[in-house]
C-alpha cells in the first residue's frame, strides 16, 4: 500500500547536457523516491545509443556513476527512475524505451490518451510509444507544431528524448520542458 507521500510522486528524469554531471547523492535520491526500476541512456564513441536498465539500486548507482564519469564530456546522459502507476514492475517497463533505431525516450507523469493494457502488464509509456510515437515521422521532434501537439495530448507529462538521428538538429529534446524544472543546469 503506497503511503500518502508516494501517491504524489511521479517518475523522475534527469537529462544532463554534455559537460554536466548528476552526482551519486542525486542518483540515490532519484532511486529512493522511485524504486521500481531505473535506466540510463547515452551516446557512445560510435554514435550509437546505449541503454542500461536495472531493478537494483546499487547497480543503478554504480553503472550510472561509471557512465557519467566516462561519457559526460561527450554525450548527453538520460537517467530515469520509475515509480509504477501502470503496468507491472519489471525490466520491460523500465525506461528509457526505444522509439526507433536512433531514438530513446523516458517519461514522467501519467499518459491518459492511451488504453490501459487489458492484462495490466504494459505501462502507459510503452502503450503510448506503440500506439502513437512509432507512427510519427522520424523528424517530428524538430517541428514545433508537432511538439506542441504531442505536449497537448500528454497533458502535464514530460517526455525526454535522446537521439542519434542525423536528420534532427539536436541530440536531445524535452516535450513539455516548461512544466518541469532544470536543477543547476
Question: What is the predicted role of each segment?
Answer:
Residues 5-67, 77, 176-185:
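Extreme N-terminus nucleophile/cap motif
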Residues 15-18, 80-86, 108, 114, ...:
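Fold-independent oxyanion-binding glycine-rich loops
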Residues 40, 93-112, 149-185:
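Conserved catalytic micro-motifs used in adenylation/nucleotidyl-transfer and phosphoryl/amide-
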Residues 50, 87-89, 114-116, 170-171:
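Short helix/loop capping segments that flank catalytic or ligand/cofactor-binding pockets
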Residues 55-67, 79-100:
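Short acidic (Asp/Glu) patches
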Residues 112-137:
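Glycine-rich phosphate-binding loop plus the immediately following alpha-helix
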Residues 136-145:
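Short, charged, surface-exposed loops that flank catalytic or proteolytic processing sites
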